[in-house]
Amino acid sequence: MDAPDAPHTPKYMDGGNTAASVTPGINIPGKSAFVELQQHAAAGYGGIRSTYQHFGPQGGQDSGFPSPRSALGYPFPPMHQNSYSGYHLGSYAPPCASPPKDDFSISDKCEDSGLRVNGKGKKMRKPRTIYSSLQLQQLNRRFQRTQYLALPERAELAASLGLTQTQVKIWFQNRRSKYKKMMKAAQGPGTNSGMPLGGGGPNPGQHSPNQMHSGGNNGGGSNSGSPSHYLPPGHSPTPSSTPVSELSPEFPPTGLSPPTQAPWDQKPHWIDHKPPPQMTPQPPHPAATLHPQTHHHNPPPQMGGYVPQYWYQPETNPSLVTVWPAV
């Protein structure tokens, strides 16, 4: 039984150390039968083990671990280890794409972050800085002194208030923009209010001559009624109203007030029922013209808009007045 062991031993072992370690195990009488059975049973695996052993020395002989186990009759653990190692490599070779898993996790994180951003609808903003009353007081004081801070001043102010330079800079920017808006708002109503004042100035002036005429002439209502009727027939005298108003005061002092009645007598050919009411205000007509004489300096621009009130003066055209004495 020992004879067949001899040829098997060199086939299983390539190193001298392993052979020396095997011989004592074979010579043990109690284990000889067990070793024989193990070796015969392993004869079928001899080719496989020989291949592994041949690969083992070629790959590296520094670890002679598989050879002693095969020599000692433990073929299954090495086969199991080899097969397991092969299975391990084979089974985990595809998942060896662990970097893709990491990438997937990273992409998941990115997607999560993207979802958070998309869920918010906008990017996260920094919280708004809340200034204390003391800080605002100091900032406003400094802003009243100067609207722009130099770098050293800004650093000093930020350090004294416990703020960052960026916060101080942004506060001053916002304060300057607010100040400009306030200035524009203050200037806008000023210009607009100036126009109503300019436009409102003539209104009192316009009312004052009316009141004066109404006070100067008790029959002003009749005069105001007559111009309303005389406006349609003659609009041409309106441009001559201004020169006549300036010239008319010159004639009444000369005692030409009686001839002023003649134009009214000549003009009423348009309307015959109006001369009687018009004759009554004629005597005070010079006095009425004297009142506008004193106020003609203020309301010359107003006469264009209120021609009907001065219509009785154009009736005293210088041409008619001068022609009447000649006749």
Curated annotation (Swiss-Prot):
It is found in: Nucleus. Expressed in the embryo in limb primordia of the head and thoracic segments. Expressed in regions of the larval leg, wing, antennal and haltere disks that form the distal-most regions of the mature structures (in the leg this corresponds to the tarsus and the distal tibia). Found in the optic center of the developing larval brain. Keywords: Developmental protein, DNA-binding, Homeobox, Nucleus, Transcription, Transcription regulation. The keyword Lipid metabolism does not apply. It comes from the Eukaryota. Residues 181-303 are annotated as: Disordered. GO terms for biological process: analia development; antennal development; cell differentiation; determination of ventral identity; genital disc development; imaginal disc-derived appendage morphogenesis; imaginal disc-derived leg morphogenesis; imaginal disc-derived male genitalia development. Its main location: nucleus. Residues 231-249 have a biased composition (Low complexity). One of its GO terms (molecular function) is DNA-binding transcription factor activity, RNA polymerase II-specific. The keyword Membrane does not apply. PANTHER family: HOMEOBOX PROTEIN, HOMEOTIC PROTEIN DISTAL-LESS-RELATED. Transcription factor that plays a role in larval and adult appendage development. Specifies the identity of ventral appendages (including legs and antennae) and suppresses dorsal appendage development. Involved in patterning the distal-proximal limb axis. May control the adhesive properties of cells during limb morphogenesis. Also has a secondary role in the normal patterning of the wing margin. This is Homeotic protein distal-less. It comes from Drosophila melanogaster (Fruit fly).
